[in-house]
């Protein structure tokens, strides 16, 4: 029997506007592709990311487009078949081969395999794909189902009827760009038999000393046997051959591996990946091969009663290690997905890992990501929370749509289930919150799934029946969570169960970020604060760059590149509550917004990680900042902008998620001297100090506190407040509570005292530092720094920063994008040199500084 032949159909593609008679075919820009990329390549539309060009290209999403190619095919042997495999068509596609319609597709997330044996020719095979407007088709579907209670946040309700990336309709951080096209590969296969699936079910003993691996291969059409090989680092671990079951077409073998090489999250161990390979045999002929990379690990979601607080925990345990899942939420890295390279995916995930993050959540309004994304997470040790693709709306549930969703879920879980990084599947993003806000029917006690379809919230059937069943069948050892946020059918804002999205800073009640300790949940899977992107990024989207007349923060073009409703008021609110700032120059305004974001996010991580208090007291098991990234150049909640330029908050999050950190909070208490007076009131400002040890070793440290007068730079206090302090592994430890150290009480001196806390090991090495300032910072009389110095070391590997008075938020800047800093936005106090690692610097590198109060 001849081996399977796979021929990529990635050459000679052309496209044209199908509903415009005089439109000519033009070559595509790349393959896979989409229509915006191809139109832009030929200069037929402007770059939608520049200026307000998004408005000029809206017609593209309402037009009809045709793609075609012509290819030759090898002979199809007797008894063999020819199949064209479409890995992804976006979205409403009619596929015609040599004049015969072979496929009608209406789901962007579904791969298709179509037998074309009887239609294929040796030469001149014409493959034509016509794409209808997803927006217009969606509008028609809405009209055809008037009894459904249509409604959503973000975009247009037509998106709810269409199985397509929901952010293409626009979101509060992204443009409306309704793409279409063959967005994933297309190839021709000729075979008598092939392997259609390969998967492994792994179980690691609680002792971690042994792992069982059950590997199953599924064959399509007749063959005899499958040879299974497992290798690690190129060395064979096991091999075995099994007969194919004549009925199911499956062959299964089980391996026991003693002393397995276990896969760990970043910082807790290595990420060894076993190669499993299946070879399909017909007699002595090797007919087909299929391989996957897997990791061996125990991964559990722990939801159990807590000591001293109501509700249940929500945290992840990997290889018996409790993981505090600090991390971030991922959106698609571009509006035009086909141009995201494998290298770019890796660079994004590497930034996450280098930022001391453990988890990334693939948000439910984008796509089931490319293999390159999950491969990078596997290799770098990043845990993945994977949403299904539903978000912020009341989805309909007619029978054909439900069947399409069932197939979508099945295909994508099968495609991704081998990745050790994926530790949870979640049914949707904020659809239960939408149900609550609109008063849609939801009775958690009612377990009659068919009855859910008759309510005004029929999507419950999708989340609690279809997706739950698919996951139970295909990934029974991976937790399934019906939504995010969700907690056992209780209100999605209940902080004592499940996960929450904490948007009462920015959205909601618009709390001060200093109150994040009162806004904690068992697992906070969204929270955030906006900041402008790098000035270079702004210049890149302004039509005239640095010379553009709209190069100021409140301009219509800059405003256009922020899609959040009410963003002007909210950015202004948090700036004016906290900082002295001015809109000019643009560079310093951008700095102020990034300082604001950095302070906000650091506050959340610092205060919430304090609630990781040890076994049985995991009051907060993780926090995922909204959001990791952007899909275009924009002002948003991201901590790294579209061009992979980290905002300053990236570094404050990195510091707070370091293996060892220290935190301080200030609390002001008013004490009347008798019951009735409002005159004689004592004001006491106290600080609380704690440390976080996320390592797996107990540490013995000294805690040193120092204080300075911010106006004079004079050191006013220096004391070891805890000597030989034991920091137990993987938890926070309370250290001290004391009054703010002042020279004279009851004269308001607390408002000018900066307090720094240090953890020092027995060799005198500094393990952690944190500088606490009076807040709000706008009240502090910041001084122009004396002798502020930021100098490259002789070998250009670091920058040394120092000053003679306390300086808030020193940011290092360099015009050269090739120069990267290991840390940034640091607070400087007298008598200390802060060393920041740098890469890409040389003798001509010029480092500049920016700080709060310089303007």
Swiss-Prot record:
What Gene3D superfamilies does the database record attribute to this sequence? Galactose-binding domain-like, Glycosidases, Immunoglobulins
Which biological process terms from the Gene Ontology are attached to this UniProt entry?
glycoprotein catabolic process; polysaccharide catabolic process
Activity's dependence on pH: Optimum pH is 5.3. Active from pH 4.2 to 6.5.
| Superkingdom of this protein's organism | Eukaryota
Known glycosylation sites = 98, 693, 730
Q: Tell me the temperature dependence.
A: Optimum temperature is 40 degrees Celsius.
**InterPro entries in the cross-refs:** Beta-gal/glucu_dom_sf (IPR036156), Beta-mannosidase-like_N2 (IPR054593), Beta-mannosidase_GH2 (IPR050887), Beta-mannosidase_Ig (IPR041625), Galactose-bd-like_sf (IPR008979), Glyco_hydro_2_Ig-like (IPR006102), Glycoside_hydrolase_SF (IPR017853), Ig-like_fold (IPR013783)
Can you state the subunit structure given in the record?
Homodimer.
Give the protein's biological function: Exoglycosidase that cleaves the single beta-linked mannose residue from the non-reducing end of beta-mannosidic oligosaccharides of various complexity and length. Prefers mannobiose over mannotriose. Is also severely restricted by galactosyl substitutions at the +1 subsite. Has no activity against polymeric mannan.
Q: Indicate the family of this protein.
A: Belongs to the glycosyl hydrolase 2 family. Beta-mannosidase B subfamily.
Q: What is this protein called?
A: Beta-mannosidase B
UniProt organism field:
Thermothelomyces thermophilus (Myceliophthora thermophila)
